Amino acid sequence: MTDNQEIKPKKLTLGNSKLSLNKSFDSLTGAQSFVNANSKTLVEVRKSSTGSATTLSLNKERNSLDQTVIDANKEEFNRRLSILKKAAEQSKLNDPSKISTLSKLASINQSANSRIEPLETDKEVEPKQQNTEENKVEVSAKIVQDDEDIPSQIPKKKEDIFVKSPLVGMRTRYGIESEKELDKTADRKIVAPKIKLEEPKKFKKADLFNMLSDDESGSGRTRSLASIKRAREKEKRKLVSQAPEKVYREVTIPEVIGVGDLANAMSERVADVIKELMKLGILANASQTIDADTAELVATNLGHTVKRVQESDVENVLISDDKVEDLRTRAPVVTVMGHVDHGKTSLLDALKSTDIAAGELGGITQHIGAYRVTLADGRAITFIDTPGHEAFSEMRSRGAKVTDIVIIVVAADDGIKTQTVEAINHAKAAGVPIIVAINKIDKPDIDIERVKNELYVHEIIGEEAGGDVMVIPISALKKINLDKLEEAILLIAEMQDLKANPFGAAAGVVIESKIEQGRGTLTTILVQRGTLRNSDIIIAGTSYGKVKKMINDKGLEILEATPSVPVEIQGLNEVPFAGDKFNVVQNEKQAKDIAEYRMRLAKEKKISIAPRSSLEDLFLKASGNSKIKELPLIIKGDVQGSVEAISGSLLKLPSDEIKLRILHSGVGPITESDLSLAHASSAIIVGFNVRAGANALTAAEKEKVDIRYYSIIYHLIDDIKAIMSGMLDPIVREQYIGSAEIRQIFNIIKVGKIAGSYVTKGIIKKRAGVRLLRDNVVIHEGKFKTLKRFKDEVKEVREGYECGIAFENYEDIREGDTVEVFELIQEQRQL
């Protein structure tokens, strides 16, 4: 039966007639219900409350007694009871309280069975018995007493199984709190009290294990916790004995590798690697590094194969080949070069129709600028403006290397100058085509032919003279012949067939870099191949980082940059050097490895070229008698190119007696750390287009550190040159002022020998230097002890007068000796 089917209990009365069940009980259904309960269902007795008993006459009770009770016999009851026991055994409950529940249920049924016999005999009793009421009360009380013995420690389950008692209409249920229906009669109802439930007992670890194991094995044997532990340990030993076979790998070993990294590469334990090292006589821990040869021996001893790589192989990821079908036409990159104030920036100003030159101090370009100009027909030209001052030779050289065409601007009224010649040499060394733009043709009294003749001297021959160089007279101010200049650029670009691969990872060159407060490191780059996008990770020299923002030459933020497009990017961890190559890499770890490798190379190179001091120099420096003086400097600038140009120009200043030592150079404002370094080393801080913050100024006043600001580079160089000149020892020069002839020697007691002399030329001064000559040979050089005219001590004696002379610490004088008098004059030296 199911839980949803409700069975109306029949009224139970006592009489002389035989008891019988009016509803048959299916033993198969009851057994199936208990089997479905499985091992996790429990037995509980459920009974429903009844109303109060009514009193009826004995004759009515006998007539209403159900005939089915009489037909029930003891064999049927026992058979069904055995079914209950079998179901309880199949439930595999290990809780003793549950077993006692079943036993008590059986005892209840036996007590009910014992009541069957008197009921059968009562059928023959006379219907007019007067003690019927008392008998019914006794039987009911006994039933209630038996019901109270039924335990309630039965946990709830979702699966319910019902069994109806064949005698008293009771319903037994697994999985839900127990309730029993007893003794419903037509005249009276006996209420059975509800059974008190106790808290369900918690299953222990062993109980759960036994339930699971019994389900699998089918046996009801209870296992102890100790046996469970032994079984688990046995399984563990079995797993250890079945260890997987060792895998031998191909291990990539660089020039230097850590012990822990080597163990990870081989998938070996660090302890095993350390043991192998100890066999080789090397004591090392997991954090120490070993060389490639030792690592190879360890890996070979452990059965692995080795692949040796060089440290420089980290840069192999930067090498890529472009397919011919991927190449696309790109815009030409044009570098404008020339002497100072010849109109390079004004030319770009005219081409861009913007006022670039107005914002430059002294009319001098201080750093490289990159611009992109779009012509009327839609074609574009990228211009790179380089400084013309001699200090920016390195920047001009870099500009020539990254360009396709060089425009050399020459002023028609000034002709060829020093930086013009240098620009020509840079262009020739780079092997790029040259266009000469003769600027300022709008000025009066100019001679273009004179400029062309000067170009011939430097092997720049125009097309009209049979050469291959295009010479175009222009006026940047009046915008004369600018269209011809643009046509010449596009013609040469078309002849060169300039192409680049816009697909794949981007690569290019750093044009300029700087640090800006609030924005961090800003780097101007020129994309030469591929497409640079936001969030790309790039490596430039020893700097690396993720591209956070890209801004074009018009100040607009863009998402990608194609070949020949100059952009300013933000996101590098430090300022790269102008001219460094940049590449896009896959991840930040790859970029970091390349940067660390390049930093090691730079450090080794710096150590190798450092000047070595001799032991004598060290002793002289320690004693303070060193002939070489030092001028320590700290240079801070707005852009990396300017700082590099300043450092290079200052180091070229010629001086054998003064060593210019640049302690630190960098991009950005002057900080307190710069002040601390300057104070510790007595250095001068040079700021080019940067200033010191409020805290740095306070520290400078307190520590009395010299800070000098400049905005034009040649003012800075002249000032440092003057400082170095002031540190040089002055030149001491002798100046002849007079001479005298010794005519007579006097010996005076307590004074010594006195030379009576006659001043023959010039003037004789007491504090001047003196030489004594005999036969035109200097026999003494010193000072006067006394100089008298008659008896008076005088400071000087002029030509034509007589005087008395005595020498300091020298008396070997004779008549006829000559006295020469001179002064020592100091002159300031210049670099």
UniProtKB/Swiss-Prot annotation:
Keyword Thylakoid: no
Region annotation (G3) ranges: 385-388
Cell location: Cytoplasm
GO MF entry, a single one: GTPase activity
Residue span(s) of domain tr-type G: 329-499
Keyword list, A-Z: Cytoplasm, GTP-binding, Initiation factor, Nucleotide-binding, Protein biosynthesis
Binding site for GTP: 338-345, 385-389, 439-442
G4: annotated segments: 439-442
Keyword Nucleotide-binding annotated: yes
G2, as annotated region: 363-367
PROSITE patterns: G_TR_2
Function: One of the essential components for the initiation of protein synthesis. Protects formylmethionyl-tRNA from spontaneous hydrolysis and promotes its binding to the 30S ribosomal subunits. Also involved in the hydrolysis of GTP during the formation of the 70S ribosomal complex.
Protein name: Translation initiation factor IF-2
